[in-house]
Amino acid sequence: NSAIITHAGMSTNSSYKVDTIPPTEEGAGITGAVGAQNNFLNAGDTVDVSVTFSEVVLDTSSGSLTLKIAVGSDNETATINSGSTTDNLTFRYTIQAGDNDTNGISIDANDISGGTITDLAGNIASDVTLEAVTDNSSYKVDTAAPSVDNFTMSDTALKIGDNATVTFVFSEQICPETDSCAVEFTNSDITAPNGSLSTLATSDNTTWTGTFVPTDDVQLDDSNVLTLGTSYTDLAGNTGPTEQTANYEVDTREPTVSSIAITAQSGISSYNFLNPGDNVSFTVTFSEQVVVDNSSGLSLTILMGSDNRSAQYTSGSGNAQQVFGYTIDDLLTSGENDSDGLSTGSNPIVLPGGSTIKDLAGNSAIITHAGMST
């Protein structure tokens, strides 16, 4: 008898799929990084390159697949990191010391090498040549430490009322005080003896300025230097070097009168009397060396009995001791007589307009004094 061959048919059996088409590479790109800040990668950071295929693929190389990426002028090797059994293979490269790329990592046209890529059916991907990918500015590379090209003060001899502009010029941008940097550059990175430094300002993160204000009441000190520490970085996180300014001088203490005394006389008798024509010298000692401008006639008021007389300035500029001289006049013509002895009242130094007494830094002297007793 003839067979009846009609049948409802066999349903799909997923255990017996058929695929004779090899997988193809459809595109590549830089897709991520670990450790980057401000679009910069540093030594030890990693960057990932993903290659997309037309279907799910297998890495049969046991992890030896590689591709080349361009870091600056050098081609570096990225190694397979993940993606087998997906349609996207990810390759990873760890940034090395000495790598630099100011434009961003790119991918030159090159082949994936180091092993075989197949689809799940075993078809070998025969065309694994990547098309070139241009510089990606989100993945620039900087492993070089910044340098300090200039670190100066506008004034290195500071007196009362002075301040100085402090200027830093770096070889590249330095991390500002924002949330985008792990370490930020602030005025706390600078040690400033005998003074303080204001908040630093910049318009380009390369040139920074601040204002140094000296501390009040500092006796002359010329051993100071501003010191930049190493707690700052460039945008990539590279630590900068320490640096110092030239020495600067701070003197914010006014010279004061320490004493007034008679230090010389001529013609005095054995009984301690001065006669007409005799000369007497008064020495005013200051707390430090002072420079005297006597252009308007500096004088010292002395008491002759109950009368005031003026001893004229004679010498001492550049020293701590300033000398005033007076010549005794004839009693008959001037009535000069003092049986108790010469003295001065309080604040005896007369400083007319145009005359000055200043220390070597230029601070005006405080000339108040209790005076010299008889």
Question: Residue ranges of each PLM-predicted region?
Answer:
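Non-catalytic beta-sheet/beta-sandwich ligand-binding modules that flank or precede catalytic cores
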Residues: 1-374
